[in-house]
Amino acid sequence: MEALSGRLTVLREFRTTDLDDYLAIAGDDRVTTWMAFDSYDRAKAEQSLAAIVARSAQENRPDYMLAVTRPDDDRVIGFGRIAPSGSWTAKLGYAIGADHWGHGYATDAARVLLGFAFGPLGRHRVTAAIGPENEASIGVVKRLGFTYEGHLREHVFTNGAWRDSLLYSLLQPEHTD
């Protein structure tokens, strides 16, 4: 798959050589406190990255888990995911390394992923499930025009406890970018 470019980010396929950058994100409690998984150690990150690379090679891939980089630097600063769910819908997810928060990278990467979901993937609806305390991520989807749909109680188990999620969605006709 060709890389997808935004104003601030480039989303490309992961490579096994991205392990150190991937671990710096997926192994950081500041990041994973907002994710649906606990922080990875090196072995778990290596296993996860190998699975991501393997899925990207499948003809009918189950998801598009892409590395987020900057246009002037190929180092991974985050990841974004579009996971088709059903014929016309997809789930959106993203994470940016804590050292890169506050620069618009998550919003830009999510915008790029939405263009991919509504364009080449032909999706009608994209959803995002976000922890109620994750104000930064809620801000991302609001900036992109998502609509709040509801509160999912004890939706994910992570970091040793059940966590609620807020469900947001965007329909293709509402997508403006």
Regions found by a protein language model. Name each.
Residues 52-56, 155:
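Short, P/G- and charge-enriched loop/turn segments at secondary-structure junctions
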Residues 1-30, 67-177:
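Acyl-donor (CoA/ACP) binding surface of acyl/acetyltransferases
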Residues 30-53, 64-66:
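Conserved GNAT-fold acetyl-CoA-binding loop/helix
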Residues 17-19, 59-62:
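Short acidic-aromatic low-complexity motifs
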Residues 38-41, 57, 130, 161:
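Alpha-helix initiation/capping motif
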Residues 56-61, 146:
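Short loop/turn motifs at secondary-structure junctions and domain boundaries
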Residues 26, 35, 56-58:
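Hydrophobic residues in alpha-helical segments
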Residues 14, 42-43, 56, 175:
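A short hydrophobic/aromatic micro-motif that marks alpha-helical segments and, especially, helix-coil
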